[in-house]
C-alpha cells in the first residue's frame, strides 16, 4: 500500500489525475531501482499507448493499455492494441517457455506488426518508419517494466512479460484506489457542485478570504487542488500560526501537513460532491458561520520552524468549500478545496469559555465505547472528536470514579432510560489533568428489543484542570492499557444492559414504559443521591422468563390484548397510591377509569397530576410511533367477539387494548348515558329546560404551558388537520376525539355544592375573533402542535385500568351519580384508535345533560393570557350570542346581575374555528346580552324568524324542506376514512338537535313539547353525535348542507370542506328556517359520496323518505358487530363509497353563475362619493378586484365575529375591518339584505354563501364585500333580533 504512495512523490513526481507521461517517450537512461514502481510503471505503461499514435492519444489509451481492453477505432490505436493482445496471448500460450523475454517479445511484436501492416501499409514508407519507431518504444517500455518487477513476482514457469504487465496493472489499480479522494472529483463531474462554481484567480481569492482572516487573527485560508492534492494558495497568516515561512507550503501536499491519524478524517469529510460551493453569496457574517458549525472537520496541522525533530501539531477547525481556481493566466481552472482553518484554543485560557457554557454531550454503547462526542468537548478536554470515538469510556475516568459507572447504568436500567442527574465524575484531559464534571445521563431504549441501545451523557465542567492548556501533550509515559478492572467493569455493564427494560415509568424515551409491570420507582428527576448511592438501592427487575413470554403471547392471541393489559397492569390498591406520592411516575392516576374518590382525595390527586404534568417528555414522535405500530398490531389480532364484548362491558376506553371490535359497541350502557362530551356541548335543546344544575367542580386556572393547545382542538377532522398524514398512523389524531376535558388546567377542584344557575357573559368585542386562511405557517404550526400533543399524551398509556364494578354498572339513561373526580381526562391515546362509544360519561346530577367537567363558574371567566398561541378554552356554557330563531323569547328574571367580562378565546385551532364557527359557542338556551341567565322553563314558541347573525344557531329543519344528500359526511377529507367507521346513532324524525341557543324551527311536536326533562334528554342524546368520534360532525353536516343549498361552494375542495363559512347563511321562512338548521334526523346517508364541488341541481326528493328510514337503519348498527361485518352486510345508505358522481362542469358553473346573478340584487349599491371614499382606504375597491385576504381558492369563513388572538395583527384582515356595512345589512337593503338574511325563500340564504368561490367581476367582489361586512357587524344583530321578534 505504501509503495505506490511513495512513488507518487518521487522520480519526476507525476501528479495523479494528469497524464502520466508528458513527453511521450521516456528517457532511455539507466532506470532507478526503487522499492515502489507504481508511478514509474504507470509512466511506462502510459508510454505504450501514448507513443504509438503520437499526439493523437490522450490519457484514455493509458487505461486501455493497462487493462488490455482498449479497442479504439483509429488505425494506430488498433494496431497497438493488437500488438499488446497478440503479445499477451502468445506469451500466455507459451507460458512454459524458458526463452529470454527480449527475444520472445521482439518476435511477437515483429510478427504481429507484419500481420497488421501487410494489407494496409504496402508502399507507405512513412507509416513503416512510424511502426518501427513504435515497436522500438514498446520494447523499451517492456524492458524497463521488467527491470522494475520485484523479485517476488518473478515466479518460475511464468512468462516474464505477462507477469510484468499484470504487476503494472495491479500497481495502477492500487494507485487509483489509494487516491480515490482525487478520483471522486472526476467521477462526479456531473454533480451540480462541479457545474455551478465560480472561477477565481489567486489575487481574487486572497482578496475575498482576507475578509475572514483579518477579522480573526487565529484563522488562515488554504486552497488544495482536488487533482493533485497540493496547495495552490495559502494566506499569510498561516506562517504566523504555524511558525514557519509561507514559501514552505508552496507546492506541498496538504495531507503531509496533517497528523497521520487525521488524514483519513480529512479525506472522508472533504469529498468534493459533499462540500458547499464557495460563491459570491458567502459572507463573513452569515454563510461562513453556518457552514463552520455544520461542515467543520477537526485536524491537527504540523508547524514549527524545524519540522524534522519531533514535529508539533496544532489543532484547527477546518471549514471546507469547493471552488475553481486559475493559478496563472494561461492555465485552465482546476477544482480546489478551499479551507478556512481556525486555531482551537483551550477553553480555560483567554478567550475563556464562560463557565455556564462549558457543556458538551457524549454517547456511548452498552459496552462503554464512545459512539459520538460533541465538538464542544475539544476545547474543554483537549481531544478532537475522532480521538475519543471507539475508545473505552472507563479509560478516561479517574480510577476512583470508574465504579460509579456501574451504578449509573443500573439507574438507567431502572428508570427505563429517563434522564437523571448524578454526582460529579473526573475525566482525564489530554494534558493528563483531571476535569471535574457534573453529569446527567439518559438511555435510549429500543422500542422492539426493549434493551438500552445507547447511553447519552450531558456533562458540565465544574472544576477546570490545573494546567489550563489542555492541548499540551502529556509527559512521555507508557501507553495506557486496559486494566483488568476496566475490562471487568465493562463486561458487567454490558451484561447489565443486555437485560430488557421492565420499568413502568410513563415517560420513557421510547414510550415503552407504560406496558411494563407497575413497580414503584423513584422519580426520574430525583438527584438526591449525591454519590450515586441511590442507584444501588432498588436493583434491576428480574427479566421475564421465556415461559412468561409464551404465556403472554398465548393470552394476547386467544383471550385478547384487553385481558393481557389488565393482567399486566393491574393497579395496586387505592390507599397505597394516595399514600406514596413518590411512586407517581409508575402509578395509574387516571381518575377517568376509577371509582369516584372521596372528597378529601381531590386536592391530593390534583396535586399529583399537576406534578406529573410538569414532567418533561423525552420521547420523540418517531419513537412513539414505533411502539404504537406494535400496539396496533396487537389490536388487529383476531379475538373472539364474545370475549371482546365481555371486555367492552367491563372496561371503558382502554388506550392500549380497545380494538376495532370495541368501537362498535358500548356494552349495556344506554344511549343516553354514553354521550360524547362534544355532542353534549352542542346539545342545546336538552339544556334549555334544565331544572337541576350540573354537579361539578369549579374551574381551575387555565394552564396551557405544558401541553399543546391543539390537543383539545375540537373535531380537527373538519379543519385542515384532516389533510395532515400522521407518520405511521392509520387512525385520526387524538385531538379529533379528545375534548377540552383533556386539558391539564381544566382539572376541577373539590366538588362543590350544586352550582347556581349559569350566568350570561357579555358579548365579546366585534373583532375578538377572526377566521384565518389556510397558510403554510398555520399548517406547519398546527402539525407541530398535533405531534407535540401526541407525545405529551402518549405517556398516559400506562395509567389505564378497567372500571370497577360500581363504575361499570349501567345506570338509567342520562343519569350518572357521583361527583366528577379531579383531573378527569380521557387517556385514550394510541393515536385515537379508541372506541367512540367508550368515552366515559361525565358525572352529573341525575337526569341532567352531561357536560365536560368545566362547569359555569359563579363569576365570569378571566381573559386568557395574551401569550397563548391558540384560543384558551371553550366559552362558558351560557353563551347566548343569538336569540332563538323560533320567535320572541321571554326574558328570564336576572337573579344575579353580572359585571361585564370578556369571553375567553375558544380552545380550538384557528382552522377549526374557521370551519366550525358554531362550535365555539355552547348550547344552553338563548338569552339577550348583558342579562343574567336563568333556566328557561318553556320552549321557544313558533313565530316568524328574525334575521340571524353570521353565527347562526343550529335549528331543526321542517320535514318538508329536504336536505342535500351530497354532504352528509362527518369528515371533510378522504384522508380520514377511518373517522367514518361507525355510522351515526339513531335519530328521530322530528327530534331535537344539538343546535345553537334556543334552537327551534317551527312548532315542536306535541310529544316533545310535553316531554319531561329526562325524556327530552334522551331525545337530545339520540339526536346528538352518538358515535363520539367528532363532536361537531353533525354541525359540519348542517353547514355543508346549507352550503349545498346556497350553491356557491363549487370551488371548495374536500380537505377544507365545501361549506366553510356557510354558517353565515340565513333566511326567513314562515314555515321554518332551513339556512343553517337541518335536523339530525334528516340525514339520508351519513356518508359522503362526493368531496368536490357541490351539485347545486342535485335532486333532493328522496331526502324525506331517507329521513324516515334512517332511524330504523342506524339502530341496527349502533351496538352490534364490528365495522367490517357491518360493511359486509350494510345497505347502500350506510356504505362509504367516495365515488364522485359524474357531473357536467359547464352546467354546474352555469347554475352557479345564475345564482350569483340573482344574488347581485342584494348587494349594496355605492354611490360615486362612497366609492371614492372606499377607494382611498381600500385599493382593491378601485381595481374592482377581491381583497388579497379573500382572493383565495379555499373557503375563507366569514361567519365568525370574534377575532383570533393569534392573527389579530394581520393587515389583510385589518383591511377588511374598515369596511363597515352595518346600516345596509340591518336595514335590509334590497332584497331584505343578504347579510342579514332578511330575504324571503333562499335569497337571504344564498346571500350568506361563503366567499370561497373566485369571482372576477366587480359585482361579485361587491357581493363578497357585503358578506364580509355582515360578518364583522354580526355582533350587533342579536339584540335587534329580540326586539324585532
Swiss-Prot record:
The modification Phosphothreonine is found at residue 121. GO terms for biological process: chromatin remodeling; circadian regulation of gene expression; entrainment of circadian clock by photoperiod; negative regulation of canonical NF-kappaB signal transduction; negative regulation of JNK cascade; negative regulation of nuclear receptor-mediated glucocorticoid signaling pathway; negative regulation of transcription by RNA polymerase II; positive regulation of transcription by RNA polymerase II. SMART domains: PAS. Gene3D superfamilies: PAS domain. Coiled coil: none annotated. It is found in: Nucleus; Cytoplasm. This is Period circadian protein homolog 1. It comes from Spalax judaei (Judean Mountains blind mole rat).
Amino acid at each position: 500500500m505504501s509503495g505506490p504512495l511513495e512513488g507518487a512523490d518521487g522520480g519526476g513526481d507525476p501528479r495523479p489525475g494528469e497524464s502520466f507521461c508528458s513527453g511521450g517517450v521516456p528517457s532511455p537512461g539507466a532506470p532507478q531501482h526503487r522499492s515502489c514502481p507504481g508511478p514509474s510503471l504507470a509512466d511506462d505503461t502510459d508510454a505504450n499507448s501514448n507513443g504509438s499514435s503520437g499526439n493523437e492519444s490522450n490519457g484514455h489509451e493509458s487505461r486501455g493499455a493497462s487493462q488490455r481492453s482498449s479497442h479504439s477505432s483509429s488505425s494506430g490505436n488498433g494496431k497497438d492494441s493488437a500488438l499488446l493482445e497478440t503479445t499477451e496471448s502468445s506469451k500466455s500460450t507459451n507460458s512454459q517457455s524458458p526463452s529470454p523475454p527480449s527475444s520472445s517479445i521482439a518476435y511477437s511484436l515483429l510478427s504481429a506488426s507484419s500481420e497488421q501492416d501487410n494489407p494496409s501499409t504496402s508502399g507507405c514508407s512513412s507509416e513503416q518508419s512510424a511502426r518501427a519507431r513504435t515497436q522500438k518504444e514498446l520494447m523499451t517500455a517492456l524492458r524497463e517494466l521488467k527491470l522494475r518487477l520485484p523479485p517476488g513476482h518473478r515466479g518460475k514457469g511464468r512468462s516474464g512479460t505477462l507477469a510484468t504487465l499484470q504487476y503494472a496493472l495491479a500497481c495502477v489499480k492500487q494507485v487509483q484506489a489509494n487516491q480515490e479522494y482525487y478520483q471522486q472529483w472526476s467521477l462526479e463531474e456531473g454533480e451540480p457542485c462541479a457545474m455551478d462554481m465560480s472561477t477565481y484567480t489567486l489575487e481574487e481569492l486572497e482578496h475575498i478570504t482576507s475578509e475572514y482572516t483579518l477579522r480573526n487573527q487565529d484563522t488562515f485560508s488554504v486552497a488544495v487542488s482536488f487533482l493533485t492534492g497540493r496547495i495552490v494558495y495559502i494566506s499569510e497568516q498561516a506562517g504566523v500560526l504555524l511558525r514557519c515561512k509561507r514559501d514552505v507550503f508552496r507546492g506541498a501536499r496538504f495531507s503531509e501537513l496533517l497528523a497521520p491519524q487525521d488524514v483519513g478524517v480529512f479525506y472522508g469529510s472533504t469529498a468534493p460532491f459533499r462540500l458547499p460551493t464557495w460563491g459570491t453569496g458567502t459572507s463573513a457574517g452569515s454563510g461562513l458561520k453556518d457552514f463552520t458549525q455544520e461542515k467543520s472537520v477537526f485536524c491537527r496541522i504540523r508547524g514549527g520552524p524545524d519540522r524534522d525533530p519531533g514535529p508539533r501539531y496544532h489543532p484547527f477547525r477546518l471549514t471546507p468549500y469547493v471552488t475553481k481556481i486559475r493559478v496563472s493566466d494561461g492555465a485552465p481552472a482546476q477544482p480546489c478545496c478551499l479551507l478556512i482553518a481556525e486555531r482551537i484554543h483551550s477553553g480555560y485560557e483567554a478567550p475563556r469559555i464562560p463557565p455556564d457554557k462549558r457543556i458538551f454531550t457524549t454517547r456511548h454503547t452498552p459496552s462503554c465505547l464512545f459512539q459520538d462526542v460533541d465538538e464542544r468537548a475539544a476545547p474543554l478536554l483537549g481531544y478532537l472528536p475522532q480521538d475519543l470515538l471507539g475508545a473505552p469510556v472507563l479509560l478516561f475516568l479517574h480510577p476512583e470514579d470508574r465504579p460509579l459507572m456501574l451504578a449509573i447504568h443500573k439507574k438507567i436500567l431502572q428508570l427505563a432510560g429517563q434522564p437523571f442527574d448524578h454526582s460529579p465524575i473526573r475525566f482525564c484531559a489530554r494534558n493528563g489533568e483531571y476535569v471535574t464534571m457534573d453529569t446527567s445521563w439518559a438511555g435510549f431504549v429500543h422500542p422492539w428489543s426493549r434493551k438500552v441501545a445507547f447511553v447519552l451523557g450531558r456533562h458540565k465542567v465544574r472544576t477546570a484542570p490545573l494546567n489550563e492548556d489542555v492541548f499540551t501533550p502529556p509527559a512521555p509515559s507508557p501507553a495506557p492499557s486496559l486494566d483488568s478492572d476496566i475490562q471487568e467493569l465493562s463486561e458487567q455493564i454490558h451484561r447489565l444492559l443486555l437485560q430488557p427494560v421492565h420499568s413502568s415509568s410513563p415517560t420513557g424515551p421510547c414510550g415503552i414504559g407504560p406496558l411494563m409491570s407497575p413497580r414503584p420507582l423513584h422519580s426520574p428527576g430525583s438527584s438526591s443521591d449525591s454519590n450515586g448511592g441511590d442507584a444501588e438501592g432498588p436493583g434491576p427487575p428480574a427479566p421475564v422468563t421465556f415461559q412468561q413470554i409464551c404465556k403472554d403471547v398465548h393470552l394476547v392471541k386467544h383471550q385478547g390484548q384487553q385481558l393481557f393489559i389488565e393482567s399486566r397492569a393491574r393497579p395496586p390498591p387505592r390507599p397505597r397510591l394516595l399514600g406514596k406520592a413518590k411512586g407517581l411516575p409508575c402509578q395509574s392516576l387516571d381518575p377517568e377509569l376509577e371509582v369516584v374518590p372521596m372528597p378529601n382525595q381531590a386536592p391530593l390527586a390534583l396535586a399529583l397530576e399537576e406534578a406529573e404534568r410538569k414532567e418533561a417528555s423525552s420521547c420523540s414522535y418517531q419513537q412513539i410511533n414505533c411502539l404504537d405500530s406494535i400496539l396496533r398490531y396487537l389490536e388487529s389480532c383476531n379475538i373472539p367477539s364474545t370475549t371482546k364484548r365481555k371486555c367492552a362491558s367491563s372496561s371503558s376506553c382502554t388506550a392500549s387494548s380497545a380494538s376495532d371490535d370495541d368501537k362498535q359497541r358500548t356494552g349495556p350502557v344506554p344511549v343516553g348515558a354514553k354521550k360524547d362530551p362534544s355532542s353534549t356541548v352542542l346539545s342545546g335543546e336538552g339544556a334549555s329546560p334544565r331544572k337541576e344544575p350540573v354537579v361539578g367542580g369549579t374551574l381551575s386556572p387555565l394552564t396551557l404551558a405544558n401541553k399543546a393547545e391543539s390537543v383539545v382542538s375540537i373535531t380537527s377532522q373538519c379543519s385542515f388537520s384532516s389533510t395532515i398524514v400522521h407518520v405511521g398512523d392509520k387512525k385520526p389524531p387524538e385531538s379529533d376525539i379528545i375534548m377540552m376535558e383533556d386539558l391539564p388546567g381544566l382539572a376541577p377542584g373539590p366538588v362543590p355544592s350544586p352550582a347556581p344557575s349559569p350566568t350570561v357573559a357579555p358579548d365579546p368585542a366585534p373583532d375578538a375573533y377572526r377566521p384565518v386562511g389556510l397558510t403554510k405557517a398555520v399548517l406547519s404550526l398546527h402539525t407541530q402542535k398535533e405531534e407535540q400533543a401526541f407525545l405529551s399524551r402518549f405517556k398516559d398509556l400506562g395509567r389505564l385500568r378497567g372500571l370497577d364494578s360500581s363504575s361499570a354498572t349501567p345506570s338509567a339513561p342520562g343519569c350518572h351519580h357521583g361527583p366528577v373526580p379531579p383531573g378527569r381526562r380521557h387517556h385514550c391515546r394510541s393515536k385515537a384508535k379508541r372506541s367512540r362509544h367508550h368515552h366515559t360519561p361525565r358525572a352529573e346530577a341525575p337526569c341532567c345533560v352531561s357536560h365536560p367537567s368545566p362547569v359555569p363558574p359563579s363569576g365570569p371567566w378571566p381573559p386568557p393570557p395574551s401569550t397563548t398561541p391558540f384560543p384558551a378554552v371553550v366559552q362558558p356554557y351560557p353563551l347566548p350570542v343569538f336569540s332563538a330563531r323560533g320567535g320572541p323569547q321571554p326574558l328570564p328574571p336576572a337573579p344575579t346581575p353580572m359585571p361585564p367580562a370578556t369571553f375567553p378565546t375558544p380552545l380550538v385551532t384557528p382552522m377549526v374555528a374557521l370551519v366550525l364557527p358554531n362550535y365555539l359557542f355552547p348550547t344552553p338556551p338563548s338569552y339577550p346580552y348583558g342579562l343574567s341567565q336563568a333556566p328557561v322553563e318553556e320552549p321557544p314558541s313558533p313565530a316568524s324568524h328574525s334575521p340571524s347573525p353570521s353565527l347562526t344557531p343550529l335549528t331543526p329543519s321542517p320535514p318538508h324542506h329536504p336536505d342535500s344528500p351530497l354532504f352528509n359526511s362527518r369528515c371533510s377529507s378522504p384522508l380520514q376514512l377511518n373517522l367514518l367507521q361507525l355510522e351515526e346513532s339513531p335519530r328521530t324524525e322530528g327530534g331535537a338537535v344539538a343546535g345553537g341557543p334556543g334552537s327551534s324551527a317551527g312548532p315542536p311536536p306535541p310529544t316533545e313539547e310535553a316531554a319531561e326533562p329526562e325524556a327530552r334528554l334522551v331525545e337530545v342524546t339520540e339526536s346528538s353525535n352518538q358515535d363520539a368520534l367528532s363532536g361537531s360532525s353533525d354541525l359540519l353536516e348542517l353547514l355543508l348542507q346549507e352550503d349545498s343549498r346556497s350553491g356557491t361552494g363549487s370551488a371548495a375542495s374536500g380537505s377544507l370542506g365545501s361549506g366553510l363559512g356557510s354558517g353565515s347563511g340565513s333566511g326567513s321562512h314562515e314555515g321554518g328556517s332551513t339556512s343553517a338548521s337541518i335536523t339530525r334526523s334528516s340525514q339520508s346517508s351519513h356518508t359522503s359520496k362526493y368531496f368536490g364541488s357541490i351539485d347545486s341541481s342535485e335532486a333532493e326528493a328522496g331526502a324525506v323518505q331517507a329521513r324516515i328510514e334512517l332511524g330504523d337503519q342506524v339502530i341496527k348498527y349502533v351496538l352490534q358487530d364490528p365495522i367490517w361485518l357491518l360493511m359486509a352486510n350494510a345497505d347502500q345508505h350506510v356504505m362509504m363509497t367516495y365515488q364522485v358522481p359524474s357531473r357536467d362542469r359547464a352546467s354546474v358553473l352555469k347554475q352557479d353563475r345564475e345564482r350569483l346573478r340573482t344574488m347581485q340584487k342584494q348587494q349594496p349599491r355605492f354611490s360615486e362619493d362612497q366609492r371614492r371614499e372606499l377607494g382611498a382606504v381600500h385599493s382593491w375597491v378601485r381595481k374592482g378586484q377581491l381583497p388579497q385576504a379573500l382572493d383565495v381558492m379555499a373557503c375563507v369563513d366569514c361567519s365568525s365575529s370574534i377575532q383570533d388572538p393569534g392573527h389579530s395583527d394581520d393587515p389583510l384582515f385589518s383591511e377588511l375591518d374598515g369596511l363597515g356595512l352595518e346600516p345596509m345589512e340591518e336595514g335590509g337593503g334590497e332584497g331584505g339584505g343578504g347579510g342579514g338574511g332578511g330575504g324571503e325563500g333562499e335569497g337571504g340564504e344564498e346571500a350568506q354563501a361563503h366567499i370561497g368561490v373566485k369571482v372576477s367581476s366587480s359585482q361579485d367582489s361587491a357581493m363578497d364585500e357585503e358578506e364580509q361586512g355582515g360578518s364583522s357587524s354580526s355582533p350587533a344583530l342579536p339584540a335587534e333580533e329580540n326586539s324585532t321578534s
